[in-house]
Amino acid sequence: DTSVSRGLGDVYKRQNTGYAVLRKKSNEITMVECGLISPKKGKEVSERLYTIFFETNNLIKKFKPEMLYVENVFYGKNVQSAIKLGQAKSSVMLAAEHNNIVSKEFSPREIKQSIVGNGSASKEQVAFMVKKIFKLDDKVLKKNDISDAIAVAWCGINRT
């Protein structure tokens, strides 16, 4: 009998929140779905955060992950950016808690180490490994947010 686990990885940014749902059966990890949550530009902050919460909540209901994995961003280029990232991250984690799903945070270094084998890897190296592992084309990874979310989910599903 083999166990199956599902993990949802989220990467939250100012404009888009990337997500990836991975499935692990025995030692095989497969991609179930990946994409972007894109709140409408020009909306109030509360509306944008609600969209992130609502869409993450829908993903949880659809895929029923056992865990939700997020990147622990502990610095920002400036204070405003750090605050906005923290707000978006909170929306994602609240959706997990709302559904009684445990969320686990990983540092950027841990995520890069897990997918590339080098904690100091560049965004390009992360995207390259994601493409290679899951045999994805450039259209799927049109935004770094998607490859980052896949890397977060990969890290999480391999460590839990």
Placement of each model-derived feature along the sequence:
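Single conserved hydrophobic/aromatic residue that forms the stacking wall/gate
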Residues: 1-8, 12
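Acidic, Mg2+-coordinating catalytic module of metal-dependent nucleases/exonucleases
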Residues: 133-160
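Proline-aspartate-enriched helix->loop->beta-strand connector
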Residues: 60-73
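Short, solvent-exposed loop/turn segments at secondary-structure junctions
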Residues: 76-79, 112-114
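Charged helix-capping and loop-helix junction motifs
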Residues: 82-91
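Catalytic-core regions of hydrolytic enzymes
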Residues: 43-63
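Short alpha-helix plus adjacent loop in nuclease-associated cores
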Residues: 101-132
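Short glycine-rich, Thr/Ser-proximal phosphate-binding strand/loop in the N-terminal lobe
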Residues: 15-46
